[in-house]
């Protein structure tokens, strides 16, 4: 299935409530998911405008075999998008017969509404507002290149490097070809919001990862040293996993689980392109993974980013016919799963640090889940005080909630996110070496006084000469 047919199928699925926009994109068989996702989002955003232009131009009357959703995608590409990709084939020829009329109807619509720009035709709720003011964050994949080399590459392409940002105001002021280094993450570059790098050669080669800053924080706060064993409990689509691998320098082991086969297949492609070699992928429900399994006996770090309502995702603002505000029943079901997954993760015997994160804004999925887990593991785990200067903290729903982090477009210029870092409050005893029950204690482990007594006894048992 080609790009335009795949985009039309996703639009039809969203409209008929077969699933969310992102979920339908991931379940498609199209190879370039990011390209498909971007095209569907933009077509959806201009949906009302495209319907008006198509109707007034009489396109569907003239082309009776052309389905409405495919027509919408094609007209978006012709009038508002990047032009037909890969030559466009028969679709370019088909739309070419109506190009003059379609352009005339778009111009007439602008005159009728008294606007000059395409985006001014959008409804207020669909215009580039707060969601489109969030900068474009680009993580340099240190498994393949260094931040300074990526910066030099962009400079040679005509971008103007402005150095390391010192405040959010520096990020808000970005425009044109300017870019910065993030003030917190040393491998994160920041570009103006509308910068599109999906076709950039460094991105296509896996040297760059297009990842929102808030999505980078869980791996950064987990911070496993090279050589560590790590579990990524709900791993797909894999951006966080690839960041963990970069922090490990591909030294150690990542056990990555996800029960969605299609998402896991897409993840396999992503981590391979990123040069990840220390990750073991498994199509498995994390709740079925046994903490007593010897394969995970050395796991000291767990990242748990479970399924959630996604209410903090910027893309939700584009899903006009999507799932909308999660219902009370759905929130309860999600929170129940999240609670089970978190308590399950805290049972791994060697665990020292766990990061729980969601892209949700709902208290039920965030502070409430964390509070319940702390109560069930009182005295064993506590919340770690992290990033004390981070401006947006957890809701004041329980003592210590200020150690949680929240993120939002308004306060941190990122997508909406929630993060809590658990650390073990007790020392895990080192297992004693295995010895035969009939063997005497190793001499090196006998206290000095006892050792002398044993030596004396041993001497008295020597044969006399």
From Swiss-Prot:
Tissues where the protein occurs: In the hippocampus, specifically expressed in adult hippocampal NG2-positive oligodendrocyte precursor cells (at protein level).
Active site: 359 (nucleophile)
Protein's GO biological process: cerebral cortex development; cognition; corpus callosum development; oligodendrocyte development; positive regulation of translation; regulation of myelination; rRNA base methylation
Keywords associated with the record: Acetylation, Methyltransferase, Nucleus, Phosphoprotein, RNA-binding, rRNA processing, S-adenosyl-L-methionine, Transferase
Modified residues (N-acetylglycine): 2
Effect of loss of the gene: Decreased body weight and lean mass without alterations in food intake. Adult mice show spatial cognitive deficits, possibly caused by defects in development and function of oligodendrocyte precursor cells. Mice display a reduction of the corpus callosum with a decline in the number of myelinated axons and loose myelin sheath. They also show impaired development of the cerebral cortex, characterized by impaired growth of radial glial scaffold.
Catalytic activity: a cytidine in 28S rRNA + S-adenosyl-L-methionine = a 5-methylcytidine in 28S rRNA + S-adenosyl-L-homocysteine + H(+)
GO MF term list: RNA binding; rRNA (cytosine-C5-)-methyltransferase activity
Cited Pfam families: Methyltr_RsmB-F (PF01189), NSUN5_fdxn-like (PF21148), NSUN5_N (PF21153)
InterPro entries per UniProt: MeTrfase_RsmB-F_NOP2_cat (IPR049560), MeTrfase_RsmB-F_NOP2_dom (IPR001678), NSUN5_7_fdxn-like (IPR049561), NSUN5_RCM1_N (IPR048889), RCMT (IPR023267), SAM-dependent_MTases_sf (IPR029063)
Keyword Nucleus: yes
Segments traversing the membrane: none
GO cellular component, one term: nucleolus
Claim: RNA-binding is one of the keywords in the record: yes
Record-annotated disulphide pairs: none
Modification Phosphoserine, positions: 167
Binding site residues for S-adenosyl-L-methionine: 234-240, 258, 263, 305
EC number(s) on file: 2.1.1.-
Subcellular location: Nucleus, Nucleolus
Family affiliation: Belongs to the class I-like SAM-binding methyltransferase superfamily. RsmB/NOP family.
Reported function: S-adenosyl-L-methionine-dependent methyltransferase that specifically methylates the C(5) position of cytosine 3438 (m5C3438) in 28S rRNA. m5C3782 promotes protein translation without affecting ribosome biogenesis and fidelity. Required for corpus callosum and cerebral cortex development.
Protein name: 28S rRNA (cytosine-C(5))-methyltransferase
Name of the gene encoding the protein in the UniProt record: Nsun5
């Amino acid at each position: 299935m080609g790009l335009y047919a795949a985009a039309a199928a996703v639009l039809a699925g969203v409209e008929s409530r077969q699933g969310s926009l992102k979920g339908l994109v991931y379940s498609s068989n199209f190879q370039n998911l990011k390209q498909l996702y971007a095209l569907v989002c933009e077509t959806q955003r201009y949906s009302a405008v495209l319907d008006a232009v198509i109707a007034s131009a009489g396109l569907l009357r003239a082309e009776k075999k052309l389905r409405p959703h495919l027509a919408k995608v094609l007209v978006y590409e012709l009038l508002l998008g990047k032009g037909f990709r890969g030559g466009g084939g028969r679709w370019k020829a088909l739309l070419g017969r109506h190009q003059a009329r379609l352009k005339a109807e778009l111009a007439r619509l602008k005159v009728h509404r008294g606007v000059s720009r395409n985006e001014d035709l959008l409804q207020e709720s669909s215009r580039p507002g707060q969601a489109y003011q969030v900068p474009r964050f680009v993580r340099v994949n240190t498994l393949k290149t260094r931040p300074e080399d990526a910066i030099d590459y962009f400079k040679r392409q005509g971008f103007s490097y402005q150095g390391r940002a010192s405040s959010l105001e520096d990020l808000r002021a970005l425009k044109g070809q300017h870019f910065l280094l993030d003030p917190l993450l040393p491998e994160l570059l920041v570009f103006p919001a509308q910068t599109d790098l999906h076709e950039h050669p460094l991105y296509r080669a896996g040297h760059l990862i297009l990842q929102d800053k808030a999505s980078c924080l869980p791996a950064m706060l987990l911070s496993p040293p090279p050589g560590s064993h790590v579990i990524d409990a709900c791993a797909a689509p894999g951006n966080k996993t690839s960041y963990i691998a970069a922090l490990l320098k591909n030294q150690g082991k990542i056990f990555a689980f996800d029960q969605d086969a299609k998402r896991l297949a897409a993840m396999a492609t992503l981590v391979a392109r990123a040069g990840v070699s220390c990750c073991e992928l498994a199509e498995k429900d994390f709740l079925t993974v046994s903490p007593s399994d010897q394969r995970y006996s050395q796991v000291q770090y767990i990242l748990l980013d479970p399924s959630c309502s996604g209410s903090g995702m910027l893309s939700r603002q584009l899903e006009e016919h999507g799932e909308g505000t999660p219902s009370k029943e759905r929130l309860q079901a999600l929170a129940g799963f999240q609670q089970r997954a978190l308590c399950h993760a805290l049972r791994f015997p060697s665990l020292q640090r766990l990061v729980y994160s969601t892209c949700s804004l709902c208290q039920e999925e965030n502070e409430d889940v964390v509070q319940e887990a702390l109560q069930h593991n009182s005295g064993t785990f506590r919340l770690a005080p992290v990033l004390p200067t981070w401006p947006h903290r957890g809701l004041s729903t329980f003592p210590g909630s200020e150690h949680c982090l929240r993120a939002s477009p308004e306060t941190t210029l990122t997508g909406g996110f929630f993060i809590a870092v658990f650390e073990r409050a007790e020392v895990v005893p080192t297992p004693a070496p295995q010895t035969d029950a009939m063997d005497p204690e190793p001499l090196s482990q006998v206290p000095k006084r006892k050792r002398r007594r044993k030596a004396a006894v041993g001497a008295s048992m020597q044969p006399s000469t």
